[in-house]
Amino acid sequence: GSAIACGESCFKFKCYTPGCSCSYPICKKD
């Protein structure tokens, strides 16, 4: 739910950082 990056990249799949979701190509806080 925010534009804050989580420091993890993703390719359409889940993010492993807690509280983060995939917003290709990076994970962002929900």
Swiss-Prot record:
Record keywords, A-Z: Disulfide bond, Knottin, Plant defense
Some GO term, biological process aspect, for this entry: which one?
A: defense response
Instruction: Give the residue range of the signal peptide.
Output: none
Q: Pfam families annotated for this entry?
A: Cyclotide
The record places the cross-link (Cyclopeptide (Gly-Asp)) at 1-30
Q: How is it modified after translation?
A: This is a cyclic peptide. Contains 3 disulfide bonds.
Record has Disulfide bond as a keyword: yes
> What is the disulfide pattern of this chain?
6-20, 10-22, 15-27
Q: What does this protein do?
A: Probably participates in a plant defense mechanism (Potential). Binds to and induces leakage in phospholipd membranes, particularly ones containing 1-palmitoyl-2-oleophosphatidylethanolamine (POPE).
- Family membership, please give it: Belongs to the cyclotide family. Moebuis subfamily.
Domain comment quoted from the record? The presence of a 'disulfide through disulfide knot' structurally defines this protein as a knottin.
For this entry, the protein name equals Cyclotide mela-5
Instruction: Name its species.
Output: Melicytus latifolius (Norfolk Island mahoe)
